[in-house]
Amino acid sequence: MAGWQPASVVSVRDETARAKTFRLALPQPTGHRAGQHYVVRLTAPDGYTAQRSYSVASAPDGTNELELTVERLDDGEVSSFLHDVVVVGDDLDVRGPIGGWFVWDGDTPALLIAGGSGVVPVMAMLRLARRLGRSELLRVVVSVRAPEDLYYADELPGPETTILYTRRAPEGFARAVGRLAAADIGKRPDSGATVYVCGSNGFADAATDVVQSLGVTTDQIRVERFGPTG
């Protein structure tokens, strides 16, 4: 993991009404793995600093650029600043990549289960699989409240992906609204597969219970819990 380094904002795009993706250019190749995160630090003129961790949404590609998707929290020091103040051309201090547990390197079968903003590191894994032409290694299940809450709506859908809605679904959507169930996963993952679960504490616990009900063993499961990151 490198120390603090400057990162230039090269693009900003909306994912939802409350989430933006920031594409950053670093001085050197990122060297990150799918599933890792970076810390963003803000420094005020009086020297006060605030820092938060954000998962990388982009797949490793050998370049010096990466994408962070940030949900805006109304009382969040860093997320509010990123959403309301930061524009293309600004510089941010970042540190990373960080994390070696919740990572996927694109060469083993995996079941990816994400709730809400927990889809961010899962998207990095899915993008990596598609870039390598290895989508058959993945099964992806993403749970959101409603269509307007879905990150990467134009890119996420695909033959390896199941999207479910817990409160309101698009008109004509085949699955009834409701929480993740064993039927959404289908057959039990192979014994050699790793299950990645990412979301809030409640979602992570519920999803873990679901996959274990299918016979998945504890040592196959890797969990990343997402709390409010302001």
Residue ranges and their predicted role:
Residues 1-88, 136, 144-146, 166-168:
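Ferredoxin-reductase
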Residues 71-230:
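FNR/FR-type flavoprotein reductase catalytic core
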